[in-house]
Regions:
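Short, residue-level hotspots on alpha-helical faces of the histone-fold
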Residues: 124, 173, 177, 199-203
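Active-site-adjacent bridging/hinge elements
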Residues: 93-94, 175-179, 262-270
Length: 270
């Protein structure tokens, strides 16, 4: 039996219909020598500081730099503690059973860095050693799936893609965990979240918000010239803007006296 793992149930159903896996089981579809299963996005991620013995926010703990990152099922917060998501744990058990029974694995997670990481984290967390190949497609039509299955690629070709995603994941953890705790301790009240991506994004939003609040409308003038060519009337606007009417009028007189205009751009609209 071959196992095909997709990133989400809807994709798995599309692949299953192509390979003839139409018998529904708990967490997968089976038939014609295939078991088509799925993740729900990231089933496995990096463990929180508590897994390394660091409880609470304490200055003496910082920076938290794990010698080796631990993988755990996706967790949800209950009160002040994180617990494994029960639905994720169930699906991981389904995957463990299928991986143990299969001859090989076809990786059908999304064709990209995060899709690669989703599978590799599950594969490593379960301690799987079965060989795997990659279904690399950007379309989910039946034709694209069949073509991709005829041209499966060696999983090792995507090792560097996985390492890139792994480095991103660990960098996010190091920056997010340590910076958030340091910021919260420095502020002295509440919990403040800081992240490698979220904080620069928030800074851009705040900057735009301040610009909007500080914006003061001002009046400016542009020159409009109406003319005709080949019996077609049209108007031309100057690119330059003038802060006062006097400057605009002076430039208009200059153009009027010269009698010539230079067309710098043309836009066609229907």
């Amino acid at each position: 039996m071959k196992v095909i793992i997709a990133e989400k149930p809807s994709v798995a159903q599309g692949i299953a219909s192509v390979v003839g896996a139409r018998q529904r089981k708990d967490g997968y579809l089976t038939g014609d020598g295939y078991a088509v299963t799925w993740a729900f996005g990231h089933l496995v991620g990096l463990a929180m500081p508590e897994s390394y013995g660091f409880s609470g926010f304490r200055r003496e703990h910082l920076p938290i730099l794990p010698q080796e990152f631990r993988l755990v099922p996706r967790q949800v917060r209950e009160g002040k503690v994180y617990k494994d998501d029960p639905g994720v744990v169930r699906q991981l058990e389904v995957l463990r059973e299928l991986f143990d029974r299969c001859e090989s694995i076809i990786v059908a997670t999304d064709a990209g860095r995060e899709g690669e990481l989703i599978f590799r984290y599950v594969y490593n967390y379960l301690g799987c050693t079965k060989p795997f190949v990659r279904l690399w497609i950007s379309s989910l039509t039946d034709k694209a799936i069949r073509e991709g299955l005829r041209n499966l690629r060696e999983g090792s070709l995507y090792d560097n893609l996985y390492l890139s995603a792994k480095a991103r994941s660990e960098a996010d953890w190091l920056v997010g965990i340590n910076s958030s705790q340091a910021l919260s301790l420095a502020a002295g009240q509440g919990v403040f979240s800081l992240g490698r991506v979220q904080t620069p994004t928030l800074a851009m939003i705040c900057s735009r918000y301040r610009e909007n609040k500080q914006f003061k409308p001002r009046t400016y003038f542009r020159i409009k010239v109406s003319t005709a060519k080949d019996g077609i009337d049209f108007s031309a606007w100057s690119q330059d803007r003038f802060d006062d009417l006097g400057s605009a009028t002076a430039k208009f007189r200059e153009v009027e006296n010269d009698g010539k205009l230079v067309v710098t751009s043309v836009e066609y609209r229907e």
